[in-house]
Amino acid sequence: MIIPVLNYYSCTRSNYMNEVDDNGNEIHGEYDNSKVKIIFFGQGNKIIFKEKIKTKKLDIVCDGNNIYIEIGKSCIINGHIRISSDCKLIIGDNLLSQFSNGYYIGEGCSMTIGNDCMFSGGITFRTDDSHAIYDVITGNRINKGKDIIIGNHVWVCENCKN
């Protein structure tokens, strides 16, 4: 069975934006080049670039409703962000993430990255496993999603997986 995507919006512009689409999805801010791809599969989502970001390639997929993303000042970020309904991603100022990394936020969780952080490459951040695991005896779910909080001045090494 194929389910059509009703609320699809893609943006690849390279200038200042202050846009709201027909589904209430908002993009505010500026980035360096046309290598940022933003896709909405939902409504009522908001992305804020507080200041011009630099990137070689950044894909942002908002896969649901009521998503909030805020990227701070003077950030260099590359990779893939996939975020689900009712989730939040807050990136502080001066993030240096020159290589491709993955940020996957689901199950109503949030990820917060402090100021002045540096990330190497091949890093995957996940708030959840994106599938349920149940205890065979109790039948209770044992892998519920949790928030990720990274403080200020944190270095994350190459190929680190959360």
Map each language-model feature to its residues.
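Terminal amphipathic alpha-helical/low-complexity segments used for targeting or macromolecular assembly
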Residues: M1-T55, D116, D129-Y134, H153
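Flexible, glycine/small-residue-enriched loop-and-beta-strand segment within the central core
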Residues: K46-N162
